[in-house]
Amino acid sequence: MNKIRKGDEVIVITGKDKGKRGVVLSVGEGKVIVEGINLVKKHVKPNPMKGTTGGVEAKTMPLQISNVALVDANGKASRVGIKVEGDKKVRFLKTTGAELSA
């Protein structure tokens, strides 16, 4: 069970974008892509077959999953824990103890 999932609101805790918030767009193997964070400029060649023009595009690149933390109701970074209730695993915030939706 992943502690951070698609759609979670996270805050960057280290790196050049420290303190910025965003929504997780996708989760990969040890990496997350967060909307509007870790933007880099990529040069793109024009391709008339696909109908794309060339130029410089801003692209969102993945971040290490350890460099982001979930945002709690108070707007602060919080670690995530997993507890077992019966036969189900439930994520919860360690700062407030609030359970997160499945």
Swiss-Prot record:
GO terms for molecular function: rRNA binding; structural constituent of ribosome. GO terms for cellular component: ribonucleoprotein complex; ribosome. CDD domains: KOW_RPL26. GO terms for biological process: translation. Disulfide bonds: none annotated. Keywords: Ribonucleoprotein, Ribosomal protein, RNA-binding, rRNA-binding. The keyword Iron does not apply. InterPro entries: KOW, Rib_uL2_dom2, Ribosomal_uL24, Ribosomal_uL24_CS, Ribosomal_uL24_KOW, Translation_prot_SH3-like_sf. One of two assembly initiator proteins, it binds directly to the 5'-end of the 23S rRNA, where it nucleates assembly of the 50S subunit. HAMAP family: Ribosomal_uL24_B. Belongs to the universal ribosomal protein uL24 family. Part of the 50S ribosomal subunit. This is Large ribosomal subunit protein uL24. It comes from Paraburkholderia phytofirmans (strain DSM 17436 / LMG 22146 / PsJN). The lineage of its organism: Bacteria, Pseudomonadati, Pseudomonadota, Betaproteobacteria, Burkholderiales.
